[in-house]
Amino acid sequence: MYSLNLINNKRINWIKNFKQESEIIYEGNPITVQNDNIIISNKNSISLFNVNGNKIWDLNIKSTLPPVISGNTVFVVNKDNFLLLINKNDGLIKYSKSINSLITKDFKKNLKRKIKKIDYLYLIDGKLLLISKNSYFIEINIKDSVNINSIKKNPFEISSDIIFLNKEMIFINKSNRIYKVN
């Protein structure tokens, strides 16, 4: 990753290499930027840097999803489908619970076999929206406590990136049909 000063004297501020020696190509998630913070995540870890390239913290959390930041909290779903809430300032994990156990607690149902790996993580109107590989939409309240508001199974598989426009979610399914969900 490069930090470039293109405004004044067009120079490189700093360079960071996140690729392991054993890797041919670095496979990371999209970079998350908020104010003066840069979050880099890959299949093995999540790291927070400031704009000067200094590492603030680094956690050994395996995730294939980019984290989401809101205020002082970083939201992550790890590879084992655990929801983690991390303090942005110091990297301490404030909350960690299996999504399946949240569902069992709030809905008294065991959907572990039905809900597959989480593929998408969004923060919308103060709630987390998790979308599983097999199109379960899980809405999680995060204001006062962490609990599940709703679970909805949709009859389609998402095969594109998701776009949010005018309070609607737009995406393409496997048979190349466009869907709008509000």
Where are the language model's segments positioned?
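Loop/turn residues immediately N-terminal
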Residues: 1-2, 44-47, 80-83, 134-138, ...
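Extended non-catalytic domains of envelope/secretory-pathway proteins
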Residues: 4, 33-38, 49, 127-128
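Short loop/turn segments that connect beta-strands within beta-propeller blades
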Residues: 5-9, 50-54, 87-90, 141-145, ...
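Extracytoplasmic beta-rich repeat domains
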Residues: 7-35, 43, 54-71, 94-123, ...
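Conserved beta-propeller blade signature
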Residues: 37-40, 74-76, 84, 127-130, ...
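Low-complexity, polar/charged sequence tracts that form flexible coils or short amphipathic helices
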Residues: 39-41, 49, 58-61, 76-78, ...
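Loop/turn-rich, solvent-exposed surfaces of beta-rich toroidal or solenoidal domains
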Residues: 77, 107-142
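Blade-level signature of beta-propeller repeat domains, shared across WD40, Kelch, NHL, RCC1
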Residues: 157-182
